[in-house]
Amino acid sequence: MLLPAEIESKSLIPALRAILAKDLAKKHNIREDEISQMLGVTQAAVSNYIRGIRGDPKLIEKLLEEKQVASMITEITDNLASDNAYTPLSLSKFIGLCNYIKSSLLICDIHHNLESDIDEVVCKECENM
């Protein structure tokens, strides 16, 4: 059984970082080494995010289809690009995005893709978080 925090760390956060890295590189013309400092990862990780090696492409597509998620990601990207750094505000917005994904139960789809034999009683616990 995977805990919600494991799902976030193994699937959700890499997908979100991939989206942010691609947006920062393409929309804001920021170099990989600068993006790595903003996201707190290595330059190699940023390269992998941009090339699609890290971050599940299907999950990325699903996240971007959600208008609220896409809007929140744009806000974070614009904040990172304007400050050219990771700030308490961008951290707060990233946490808010993860919390939204959990509270809107989008995380359940991710969980079901990782584990197909989830007990429905256990699954319903996320609704109470």
Language-model region placement:
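Short coil turns linking two alpha-helices in DNA-binding domains
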Residues: G40-T42
